[in-house]
Amino acid sequence: MPASPPSGELATEVAGRYAIFFNGQPCGEERWRIASSAEGLIVTGEQEMVPPHPFPNRQAYRAVLTREWRATGLEIQWTVGERRLVATHHADLTTWRARIEYQDHVKEQEGDYPNYCEVEYVTHLFNSFILAKRDFQLGGEHEFPVLRIGPPYMAVTPERMLYRCVELGTWASPLGPLPAKRYVVSLTSRGEDEGYTFWADEHDVVLESYEGLDPSRPWMRLVEYRRGT
C-alpha cells in the first residue's frame, strides 16, 4: 500500500472504492480511506451490501495499524435490518482482546497475538496489509498464523493461512493498466480448493478478487482510487 512504503515516503491520505458482486451481479460497494496520524495509520471504511446479495447488511469500521503494518485495533459496527452488533478489538502487545456487544449480550475474547501473526477482516485492505510486509516473486509462498474476524459475530477465529503468487500480468485499474500479480489465498486446514484468488498492483492494492478460484465470478473490483500528497 502506498500510504507508507518501505522507502519511508508518506502519502497523507489514500482512498478508494470497491464495487461488490454476488454471483456475478453488482450488490453493493465499499468506500475506504487510509490516513497517517500520530497514532499510526488510521483506516476507516463503510461496506454496504444490497440485493441480490442474500444477506443485505452494512458495516462501518475503523482500524489502527503501526507504520510496519501491524494491526493494533479494529472497531466494527455491523447492521443487518434492525439488528446492530458492535465489536471492539485491540492488541495489548502480544495479546489480542475482543468485546462483542449484541442486543443485551456481551462476549469477550482474549488470545495470543505474536509478532508474526496477521489479522484478516472482510475488507481487502487487510490483504494489502499482509502483502505489504512480504516480498513475493512468481511461485513464492508465505504461511503464517492469522486471526480471522468476520460474520456472524465479528469475533476471532485463529487459523493458519497460505498466500501464493501464481501469475504475473498487466491489469486494468482506475489509474490505467498496471503491472500486477495474482495471488491464491487459502487456509491450511481446508486446502486451496476452498480458497480464493485476487490481483494486486505493485503497491499491494487489491485490484480485483473472485468468489473462489474462478476468474469468471468477480467478488470485489477497485473502481476508484486516489492518493493525497
Put a short name on every predicted segment.
Residues 2-102, 140-229:
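Acidic, serine/threonine-rich low-complexity disordered tracts
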Residues 92-149:
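Surface-exposed beta-loop interaction hotspot
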